[in-house]
């Protein structure tokens, strides 16, 4: 298994597009692993700050990260994994009432449809369904 990572400069640009404040970007960078210009999530990432608790910003950070993972994916499996991450954030944003992030992901999904051909987040990207006996 490989550790999921993205190109740091691309992630920085994506975080700006998602409107993540600089102090949140710095906190995320401090809690992530950086090596050879690539950023990977810490295996047990946890926001232990007392003052940086805005769910909108943390959801935006994670959406930006997984959109970069999708963009850099080199296999169908990696694309499916990234889409699953984006889907999870989409439904988490909805459950937390963070409509802005839900709407931004919905727009991203619509814009990238020609690449992934999945009509909506509630549709599976898996092409071979498991058979249960």
Please describe what each predicted stretch is.
Residues 1-4, 52, 115-133:
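Short intrinsically disordered terminal tails
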Residues 55-64, 79-82:
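Short amphipathic alpha-helical heptad-repeat segments
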Residues 69-80, 94-98:
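Charged, low-complexity interaction regions
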